[in-house]
Amino acid sequence: MATDLSSSSTLLLSRNCKTPPFYHTTNSLSLSKTHHLYASRNAVVSRLRLLCQTTGSTQSTPTSGVSDLQFAAQVGQHRLSKVPISNIRNFCIIAHIDHGKSTLADKLLQVTGTVQQREMKEQFLDNMDLERERGITIKLQAARMRYVYENKPYCLNLIDTPGHVDFSYEVSRSLAACEGALLVVDASQGVEAQTLANVYLALENNLEIIPVLNKIDLPGSEPDRVIQEIEEVIGLDCSNAIRCSAKEGIGIIDILNAIVERIPSPRNTAEMPLRTLIFDSYYDPYRGVIVYFRVLDGSIKKGDRIYFMASKKDYFADEIGVLSPNQMQVEELYAGEVGYLSASIRSVADARVGDTITHYNRRAQSSLPGYKEATPMVFCGLFPVDADQFPEVRDALEKLQLNDAALKFEPETSSAMGFGFRCGFLGLLHMEIVQERLEREYNLSLITTAPSVVYRVNCVDGDTVECSNPSLLPEPGKRRSIEEPLVKIEMLTPKDYIGPLMELAQDRRGEFKEMRFITNSRASITYELPLAEMVGDFFDQLKSRSKGYASMEYTFIGYKESDLIKLEIQINGDPVEPLATIVHKDKAYPVGRALTQKLKELIPRQMFKVPIQACIGSKVIASEALPAIRKDVLAKCYGGDISRKKKLLKKQAEGKKRMKAIGKVDVPQEAFMAVLKLEKKPWSYKYKMSVNC
């Protein structure tokens, strides 16, 4: 079958031509022109022969007598052949969650022949089990693709990014390593809140943005309406927007051609001293720290002595290579290319994300501007169930922090739970993902305290103290005022749900700022509200009240003084530190009442009566009593003298009194999350802790 390599038709890299899979492609925006093309092994050989001619490679092309493994190896080697820097394109895919980023990345890998059909699976770049189970992207991933356009080979470096607001830091790291971005918008849902946030990040990095309308094959898709939304809300010119269906393979070639035509190539700075920017890294137990980097200036070879400018450490580059998408070794990487590095780095602190790598003997004059430091917004305590696992928890957090630069932690002690760590996260989903990764990847058993935010306490002596742990809040006589963090939240919703969402924001002490209609049927509502009011079930309530149609995006704007107090929980007369929380004075009573009632349901009944109290200082504002389990000590008495029964009842009462004084109350794990009524999965509840009461 003859194949025109210069046309924008789809070429399928398939060895078996008897039952070849197929792709849809279109050379225009009309679905009626969709056609199917089949390519056999001979077409692949022809394409590789063209690559050899255009790159000047002397390696022979695959012949009919080579084996499957040899054939695949030769395909891989041609992907590694060098191309001019003018033929390199670095781009990422940004979008709102569930708009089809990972599916589009899968199809790009498949159409360019980077991944063979038999190796293909859904969410190919999502390596973690958590990502596949939840259907979301958590970690950015990179892949190198080879594409022939107008008889010239191009190297396309793709970086797939997360879509959830909690992982916007991952997106910012991807953008710093690219010159362009594919802005993917669901043609049926339209512009969402995170779409706006990602576009603003891309514009700040001066990226060329290519609008892509995905899922046009759905019956409810409205591409014309969505194009109008993008132009009115974002201000992008969508006259050349690409309409595609990543699932069906429609418009994929148009996207690849647009990447080549519209995204600029990197600057040619190969003669300058080496400067590479680390945009990701992870810890391998056998090879040490593996660094993902983008070469901005100069070139790096295998065996070079390299220097990390921030940590001031030097190593020898034992192995360098590209991600295609699996790691493939090369001898040298030049300016504009993206790759990985292994240098037997054993200390996780020596290769931080955002650091600059240069040559040890020919150092660059200045380091590259690193990333904006991630600011944790939500804090909670992580404690091992087994106190002997404290060193393992510390090592696991250090290794996880290497791969997740937004994670912050410091040691913490609690009279109830012993030694642990106070950890900072970007949001609730980030917190949940980190805890589950610690339990899955490092086999740890953890207890999580209720999440909180960082408060600023202005003391009477003039000092300002930041407090993320309610149990460490200064005494009332030592503090003058308390400031809480504020966020600006933008909710995009159909007009039918404007009322319920405004009611939700006002119930959470929100201050209305602006409302504007994006289209006749969709509106944008802006509020300022305390971050503490969002830490909980705010997102769940937003989805519930809008029947799943609304989306939100928030940004931190600063601190504001507020009338806040510390609410303590006492069980059997003793305070339980992990259950302490900071609340607004007007909400103290309803929160205390709801919390004591919730704890009464969660704490198992004891052999003695257990009082559960919510206190502000020494004042009890809400109280519940957990009744004792009654044992019928008179069951064996069948008549007889009444004094015998009185003696047994008196003995039982004395025993209960003694037990109440020295007894222990088991507080289940879900009690710590009950402070904010978080709905956790069953695996979070399987551990209990004992509080001496």
UniProtKB/Swiss-Prot annotation:
Protein name: Translation factor GUF1 homolog, chloroplastic
Keyword field contains Transit peptide: yes
EC numbers on record: 3.6.5.-
GO BP terms: positive regulation of translation; translation
GO MF assignments: GTP binding; GTPase activity; ribosome binding
Recorded family membership: Belongs to the TRAFAC class translation factor GTPase superfamily. Classic translation factor GTPase family. LepA subfamily.
Location, primary (coarse class): plastid
Catalytic reaction list: GTP + H2O = GDP + phosphate + H(+)
Protein task: Promotes chloroplast protein synthesis. May act as a fidelity factor of the translation reaction, by catalyzing a one-codon backward translocation of tRNAs on improperly translocated ribosomes.
Domain tr-type G: 86-267
InterPro entries, per the entry: EF-4, EFG_III/V, EFG_V-like, EFTu-like_2, G_TR_CS, GUFP, LepA_C_sf, LepA_CTD
Pfam families the UniProt entry points to: EFG_C, GTP_EFTU, GTP_EFTU_D2, LepA_C
Residues that coordinate or bind GTP: 95-102, 160-164, 214-217
Keywords: Chloroplast, GTP-binding, Hydrolase, Nucleotide-binding, Plastid, Protein biosynthesis, Transit peptide
Cellular location(s): Plastid, Chloroplast
